């Protein structure tokens, strides 16, 4: 987890987006043991702590000096709004650091430049969202 590698907080997913939506595919294994061992973890909210938690989580490994909250899967439907969630979390983090008078570094990556992208209906088929559309031709 990023929070045991120098980050104070992390909110997001650890996989490329199509790995997150694979469990929704018709041919994805339905066996709960398979999903528990190989399925993607959800959207995670993690915080570094000073307390060493020796618990070994079957999905995350040794917890260590952090807290880990799985906020749920990154489904195709949630992908429509995940950038809103992560942007809100980033702004909240920055505001808290400013209010505390602490210097900070915020690494914020949205999902819109990645393959696969699922957007809300009102954002579909808008000019400029599809590569090549509105590009001058030679």
Positions of PLM-derived features:
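Formylglycine-dependent
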Residues: 1-102, 110-124
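A short beta-strand-to-alpha-helix junction
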Residues: 76-82, 128-138
